[in-house]
């Protein structure tokens, strides 16, 4: 039996005819293999049958997708350029530079450029809101009030002398320091022991 006499496949007629068609192909191939002279012819027949099945299957599937309107679904959704990954050096996948930038902030109070790491302490000092700044501000207010009250008392005829109205700020500081030293002397140096 020659390849010209073999039945050729003309396409897939459905999944129901697939099993008988495969069995006829196998039977025809076995008949060709029986004679050693026909091995080349049998290989060509098998290759041609497989190629025809594959091509006809693809054509049928494409035709079905085109008729049903689903052919465009094979292409998929086009990718937006905004969502593409960036593959440039020194940039991350979103296109943002990975190099370190010095971060500077502008102080809203004095309009100076301040490093981001120093912005909070600067703002505290600049606005007078921190612990140390509030102490300084309270001293300023106390000195202003003391100066204005002393000025009012001395300008009026209250009969007092200037020495009585003066507030001795340095003596208060000395007194505070001496009180703190006396507290620490007994507890830290001697550990509560007296000699």
Curated annotation (Swiss-Prot):
Residues that bear Phosphoserine: 171
Intracellular or extracellular location(s): Nucleus, Nucleoplasm; Cytoplasm
Main location: nucleus
Pfam families linked: Sgf11 (PF08209)
GO cellular component annotations of the record: cytoplasm; DUBm complex; nuclear pore; nucleoplasm; SAGA complex
Zinc finger (SGF11-type): 105-126
Keywords: Activator, Chromatin regulator, Cytoplasm, Metal-binding, mRNA transport, Nucleus, Phosphoprotein, Protein transport, Transcription, Transcription regulation, Translocation, Transport, Zinc, Zinc-finger
KW Nucleus (keyword) present: yes
Sequence segments annotated as region (Disordered): 1-22, 140-195
Gene3D superfamilies noted in UniProt: Classic Zinc Finger
GO molecular function: transcription coactivator activity; zinc ion binding
Compositionally biased spans, kind Low complexity: 179-195
GO terms (BP aspect): chromatin organization; mRNA export from nucleus; positive regulation of DNA-templated transcription; protein transport; regulation of transcription by RNA polymerase II
Assembly behavior: Component of some SAGA transcription coactivator-HAT complexes, at least composed of Ada2b, not/nonstop, Pcaf/Gcn5, Sgf11 and Spt3. Within the SAGA complex, Sgf11, e(y)2, and not/nonstop form an additional subcomplex of SAGA called the DUB module (deubiquitination module). Interacts directly with not/nonstop. Interacts with the AMEX complex component xmas-2. Interacts with Cbp80; important for promoter recruitment of Sgf11 that is not associated with the DUB module.
Domain notes: The long N-terminal helix forms part of the 'assembly lobe' of the SAGA deubiquitination module. The C-terminal SGF11-type zinc-finger domain together with the C-terminal catalytic domain of not/nonstop forms the 'catalytic lobe' of the SAGA deubiquitination module.
Role noted for this protein: Component of the transcription regulatory histone acetylation (HAT) complex SAGA, a multiprotein complex that activates transcription by remodeling chromatin and mediating histone acetylation and deubiquitination. Within the SAGA complex, participates in a subcomplex that specifically deubiquitinates histone H2B. The SAGA complex is recruited to specific gene promoters by activators, where it is required for transcription. Required for nuclear receptor-mediated transactivation. Binds independently on SAGA to promoters in an RNA-dependent manner.
Family: Belongs to the SGF11 family.
Name of protein: SAGA-associated factor 11 homolog
Species annotation: Drosophila sechellia (Fruit fly)
Lineage of the species this protein comes from: Eukaryota, Metazoa, Ecdysozoa, Arthropoda, Hexapoda
């Amino acid at each position: 039996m020659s390849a010209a006499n073999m039945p050729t496949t003309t396409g897939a007629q459905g999944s129901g005819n697939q099993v008988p068609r495969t069995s006829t192909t196998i039977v025809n191939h076995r008949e060709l293999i029986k004679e050693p002279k026909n091995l080349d012819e049998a290989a060509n027949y098998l290759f041609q049958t497989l190629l025809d099945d594959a091509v006809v299957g693809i054509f049928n599937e494409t035709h079905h997708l085109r008729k049903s309107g689903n052919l465009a679904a094979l292409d998929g959704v086009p990718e937006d350029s905004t969502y593409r990954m960036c593959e440039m050096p020194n940039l991350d996948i979103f296109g943002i530079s990975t190099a370190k930038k010095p971060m500077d902030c502008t102080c809203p109070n004095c309009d100076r450029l301040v490093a981001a790491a120093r912005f909070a302490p600067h703002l505290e000092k600049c606005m007078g809101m921190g612990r140390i700044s509030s102490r300084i501000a309270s001293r300023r207010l106390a000195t202003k009030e003391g100066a204005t009250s002393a000025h009012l008392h001395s300008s009026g005829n209250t009969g007092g002398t200037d020495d009585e109205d003066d507030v001795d700020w340095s003596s208060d500081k000395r007194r505070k320091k001496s009180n703190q030293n006396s507290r620490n002397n007994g507890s830290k140096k001697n550990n509560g022991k007296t000699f």
